[in-house]
Amino acid sequence: MMSHFGDWLSSEYDIDFVPQPEDFGQTMRYRHSGELVAKDKMWLLLDGFFKTEMHRQTLVPHALEALGRIDEVADIVILTNLGDQFHASRVAQLDAVGIRHHVICNLGGKGPAVSKLVDDRAPARAVFVDDIPGHHRSVAEHRPEVWRLHMIADPVIARLIAPAPDAHKRIDDWAEAVDWIMDRLTQD
């Protein structure tokens, strides 16, 4: 998502987007002046992207095949950090690339939402996959028994962000990650 968002900012607003692992407030600068985009404007731009540009997001290599394998042994829930107003567009965007699983919108740390999912579904084992280190920390705090895989499928972004200290493993390719996930889900 990040590279698609950055491409959109560049083409539509002449804003350079350089992801920063710990401070989203430092990620956007006006190309002509080098000045930071104000934080309130940043959130408006992000909302604007999700309102009109979600279709720019493309399928991550090997994701569809990996999810197909995982779906054979587990329920898949996509926990997306978007407001509820974007639920229908997120479902449509995922459906357009062949991903058809339950989608839940969330704002903030994902630990409470993961905890509720575990309470509601009572799985024997659960695996959480996310690109944001803070979400791994949140899940570790709320549900330490959940396996946590840090994955950043965008290679440009992956080079910028260190492995999440609260994740059990960092794998940035679904073709490799699926075996790690399946091992956790099917262990006795």
Residue ranges and their predicted role:
Residues 1-42:
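Active-site neighborhood of HAD-like aspartate-dependent phosphohydrolases
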Residues 27-56, 107-129, 180:
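N-terminal/domain-start segments enriched in small and hydrophobic, helix-friendly residues
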Residues 37-39, 48-78, 84-91:
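Short, acidic loop-to-helix structural element flanking the phosphoryl-transfer center
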Residues 75-76, 125, 147:
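Residues at the starts of beta-strands that form the adenosine-phosphate
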Residues 83-127, 135-141:
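Substrate-recognition "cap/lid" segment bordering the active-site pocket of phosphatases
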Residues 102-108, 168-176:
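Short acidic-hydrophobic, aromatic-tinged amphipathic segments that line or gate anion-handling sites
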Residues 112-115, 157-166, 180-182:
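Short, charged, surface-exposed secondary-structure boundary motifs
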Residues 128-172:
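Acidic, Mg2+-coordinating phosphoryl-transfer loop and its flanking beta/alpha structural elements
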